[in-house]
From Swiss-Prot:
Organism of provenance: Oryza sativa subsp. japonica
GO CC terms in record: plasma membrane
Broad EC category: transferase
Family per record: Belongs to the protein kinase superfamily. Ser/Thr protein kinase family.
Compartments reported by the entry: Cell membrane
Note: Plants silencing BSK1-2 exhibit compromised responses to chitin- or flg22-triggered immunity and resistance to Magnaporthe oryzae.
Induction per the UniProt record: Induced by treatment with the elicitors chitin or fagellin22 (flg22).
Residues annotated as domain Protein kinase: 79-338
Location, primary (coarse class): membrane
Protein name per UniProt: Serine/threonine-protein kinase BSK1-2
Length: 522
């Protein structure tokens, strides 16, 4: 494939083959250090762990080395941080992928604690093993831990479809439908009941950020809330307005405290926003149900179901712990409210349909960056997160606009790109394609990042031919941009052109290596 100059735009047809560079000799093989299993599940626990048909069962709990987790997270790269507060979070959570024969490419979430959180490594390991014995389809299960010097890390199943907080409070295109909200409440109540039955009843800081959505869009409860910071004993990191009254009095968490926090989640589901419990109770007592319901749900829910949920939330938020219902009562009340059981969660949540894992291309010949690793694994979700986090950093210098060119048409074009960015961030890939196409069609400004993002959108919509065209367009705009080659590698693999895909991966890694050397200097 020939390269175009950065000032030219090319047609939409795809050349027959992408460009190739000379292949360097492969590096010597690296030894693999397998994980050390701590224990295996008994038959009863294994049966309890059966999840949705398309979801892989959680592996046995294991102890990991720091080197393994560093490799899995790309050296704890900032691009792999998935904590809601980003790098400002006190305990960072990273996306990762287990490498080597023992890892099997499994996606993981790695929680990295601050150095003073768990001073006693034995206490940390014992607590982690206790939580690691739990296995349930309604939970993002803990699959391992790491104690290395001052480092304390937990390893859990990775949930790729964000948090309940993200879907409730930060949506741009579509509010969660009513039946899905009822499903969330029921699934989390089931998870809490399971933990209680397994003698792990205390869940710390239960809130909408602890509710995660798996590859099928099913809601799951994060296992991280089953462990607390052992040094300061804090169980609630959120605003004190949302903590149980008894915790403010004596600093202790009880099963009734967990029920109170569950009540705050019910209020979140009803209102679509964070309302302090005292204010929510005042609204419930003095006004109609409609006052607390999210306006986007108007006319889309059953008054009887909403009344039941509001009444249950009110009981959970009672000041006196003895006046709150127990976990079993929550489950029994929420179970009859479940509707649309035949509709998959991913449909109601509005996330892409889960697919079988595509065949990955052969291993490249160079060490890869997080972007390269994601592309070599065909991990479209990881690629999406990286493209969101890098934003338009690589577009600098590709366009220089004079004052005369800053027209209303230009403003409209940038507005289309902005709308595309919002849709891309929120995984509304079809809308992102439409908005980015409006931007591209004007032609005043050429952005390699827009082509890369639209390429990924096409991949998410099972359009590999269009994805390859856009990745090649990105290369034409920015001939030595590694991301353009990486996106071509993914599209080629989707088109079953594995040899060409490997060439693209190697070429991209060479470009990245060359870029790093130029930054460091001689």
């Amino acid at each position: 494939m020939g390269c175009c100059g950065s000032s030219l735009r090319v047609g939409s047809h795809a050349p027959e083959k992408p460009p190739r560079r000379a292949r360097p000799p492969p590096p010597p093989p690296q030894p693999h250090h397998p994980r050390r299993p701590s224990f295996t599940l008994n038959a009863h626990q294994a049966a309890a762990s059966s999840s949705a048909a398309s979801a892989a069962p959680a592996p046995a709990f294991a102890e990991f080395s720091l080197a393994e987790l560093r490799e899995a997270t790309g050296g704890f790269a900032a691009a792999n941080i998935v904590s809601e507060s980003g790098e400002k979070a006190p305990n960072l959570v990273y996306r990762g992928r287990l490498q080597g024969a023992g890892g099997g490419g499994r996606a993981i979430a790695v929680k990295k604690f601050g150095k003073l959180a768990w001073p006693d490594p034995k206490q940390f390991a014992e607590e982690a093993r206790g939580v690691g014995k739990l296995r349930h389809r309604r939970m993002a299960n803990l699959i391992g831990y790491c104690c290395d010097g001052d480092e304390r890390l937990l390893v859990a199943e990775f949930m790729p479809n964000d948090t309940l907080a993200k879907h409730l409070f930060h949506w741009e295109n579509k509010a969660i439908e009513w039946a899905m909200r009822l499903r969330v409440a029921y699934n989390i109540a089931e998870a809490l009941e399971y933990c209680s039955n397994e003698e792990r009843p205390l869940y710390h800081d239960l809130n909408a950020y602890r509710v995660l959505f798996d590859e099928n869009g099913d809601p799951r409860l994060s296992c991280f809330g089953l462990m607390k910071n052992s040094r300061d004993g804090k169980s609630y990191s959120t605003n004190l307005a949302y903590t149980p009254p008894e915790y403010l009095r004596n600093g202790r968490v009880t099963l009734e405290s967990v029920v109170f926090s569950f009540g705050t989640i019910l209020i979140d589901l009803l209102s679509g926003k964070r309302i302090p419990p005292t204010l929510a109770l005042d609204m419930i007592r003095s006004r109609s149900i409609q006052a607390i319901m999210e306006t986007n749900l108007e006319g889309k829910y059953s008054i009887e179901e909403a009344t039941t949920l509001v009444d249950l939330a009110s009981k959970c938020l009672q000041y006196e712990p003895r006046d709150r219902p127990d976990i079993k009562k929550l489950v029994s009340i929420l179970q009859p409210l479940q509707t649309k059981s035949e509709v998959p969660s991913y449909v109601m949540l509005g996330v892409p349909k889960p697919e079988e894992v595509p065949k990955a291309p052969p291993a490249p010949q160079h060490p890869l960056s997080p972007m390269g690793e994601a592309c070599s694994r065909m991990d479209l979700t990881a690629i999406h997160q990286i493209l969101v986090s890098t934003h338009y950093r690589d577009d600098e210098g590709t366009n220089e606009l004079s004052f005369q060119e800053w027209t209303q048409q230009m403003r409209d074009m940038l507005d289309a790109r902005k709308r595309g960015d919002f849709a891309f961030r929120d995984k509304n890939f079809k809308q992102a394609i439409d908005c980015y196409t409006q931007f591209v069609d004007v032609g005043t400004m050429v952005s390699p990042t827009v082509y890369a993002r639209r390429s990924l959108c096409h991949l998410m919509c099972d359009q590999p031919d269009a994805a390859l065209r856009d990745a090649m367009q990105a290369q034409c705009v920015y001939p030595d941009w590694p991301t353009a080659f990486y996106m071509q590698a993914v599209a080629l693999s989707k088109l079953n052109m594995q040899s060409d895909s490997l060439d693209m991966l190697n070429e991209a890694s060479q470009l990245e290596e060359k870029r790093q050397k130029s930054i460091k200097g001689p």
